[in-house]
């Protein structure tokens, strides 16, 4: 597969200082001093408080708790578990582990998704995380058709970049699948999503595993047929919809307004009976689930442009995506996601009802209190 990382060149072929993708950025990152564990502990405390103030009771760690340095990744995981016991971590966290290969996963024998790693329900095991393509805003999201407006240096047929062919991806993730891990793969463009979809289909052909619940992370530009095939393979989309609100016009300029009309097609998923979640990919976009809910309902950017109104969903559908469906995708629907006897008393008190306010006002609703396990972890002064 292509190495998803280059140094950008100007018209004369000279480097212009832009580093595209993780491998290229690593050239600089390895010279930047890392954070100490004490600094990470302080950051966990700050972030936990910030998430709670937005009404979030469970956050996913993404690969943040498993950096490229495997040894450091394990130390950070131990720090998170320690913070779950000393009160530093006030909300619940699901750990996603960077899965460059099986050796990165070896330190995590309790890898069944949803496993309580901390013993108090604060930290649970999530998925093994990989990447298939880049980001459309950086012209690295991989599409089946060329970008309509792109740097001439990349050529008229440029479709973005991918990390693996289907065969390469299957070879990498089949052992992970056989070992019982949940797998989560970053894919934005319909080309990247196609590679991941074919790989998930192949996994189930080679080693059938009911209820694997593999994920496509971000899944910004899937076709209807790709969503159908994901459902048939027992896989699910995790829609990164907030860029439609923050940068809808930028996406339209990069990939075309017709494509953006199908950005994170929640209505299609609802029509197919395919559960999905909504996420912020923080710090890429601000931590605020109500912006995600509002965007799924209105399909409107902050500048007021509406993209793909036929993909709008009801407020109830969007709320399910950040509650019970999010819990389901984490294998935690038995303890989270709804106010049901026997589940954790994790809940949020809002100043207004998102089901009855004007749809465009949902994003402005204030969070009054956030509860985790029945305890108040945030209260608006």
Residue ranges of each PLM-predicted region?
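Divalent metal-binding segments
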Residues: 1-111, 126, 130, 135-192, ...
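His/Asp/Glu-enriched, well-ordered alpha-helical/loop segment
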Residues: 42, 174-184, 191-214, 218-219, ...
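Accessory "access/gating" subregions that flank catalytic or transport cores
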Residues: 115-119
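Basic/polar N-terminal segments that are highly enriched at the extreme N-terminus
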Residues: 380-381
């Amino acid at each position: 597969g292509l190495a998803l990382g280059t140094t950008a060149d100007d018209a004369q072929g000279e480097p212009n200082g832009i580093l595209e993708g993780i491998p290229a950025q690593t050239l600089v990152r390895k010279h930047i001093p890392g954070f100490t564990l004490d600094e990470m502990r302080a950051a966990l405390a700050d972030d936990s408080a910030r998430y709670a103030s937005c009404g979030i009771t469970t956050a996913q760690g993404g690969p943040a708790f498993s950096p490229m340095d495997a040894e450091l990744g394990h130390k950070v995981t131990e720090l998170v578990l320690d913070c779950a016991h000393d009160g530093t971590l006030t909300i619940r966290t699901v750990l996603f582990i960077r899965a460059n290969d099986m050796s990165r996963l070896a330190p995590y024998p309790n890898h069944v998704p949803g496993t309580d790693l901390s013993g108090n329900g604060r930290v649970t095991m999530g998925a093994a995380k990989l990447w298939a393509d880049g980001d459309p805003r950086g012209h690295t999201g991989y599409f089946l058709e060329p970008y309509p407006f792109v740097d001439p240096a990349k050529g008229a047929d440029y479709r973005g970049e991918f990390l693996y062919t289907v065969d390469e991806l299957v070879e990498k993730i089949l052992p992970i699948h056989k070992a019982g891990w949940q797998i989560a793969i970053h894919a934005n463009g319909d080309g990247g999503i196609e590679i991941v979809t074919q790989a998930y289909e192949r996994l189930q052909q080679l080693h059938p595993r009911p209820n694997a619940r593999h994920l496509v992370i971000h899944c910004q530009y899937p076709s209807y047929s790709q969503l159908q095939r994901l459902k048939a393979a027992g896989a699910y989309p995790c829609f990164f919809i907030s860029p439609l609100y923050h940068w809808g016009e930028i996406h339209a300029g990069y990939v075309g307004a017709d494509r953006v009309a199908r950005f994170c097609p929640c209505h299609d998923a609802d029509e197919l009976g395919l559960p999905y979640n909504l996420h912020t990919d923080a710090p890429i976009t601000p931590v605020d689930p109500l912006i995600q809910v509002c965007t799924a309902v209105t399909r409107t950017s902050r500048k007021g442009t509406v993209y793909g109104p036929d993909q709008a969903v009801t407020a109830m559908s969007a709320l399910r995506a950040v509650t019970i469906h999010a819990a389901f995708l984490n294998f935690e629907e038995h303890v989270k996601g709804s106010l049901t006897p026997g589940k954790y008393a994790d809940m949020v008190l809002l100043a207004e009802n998102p089901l009855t306010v004007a749809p465009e006002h949902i994003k402005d609703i204030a969070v009054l209190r956030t509860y985790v396990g029945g305890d108040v972890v945030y209260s608006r002064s």
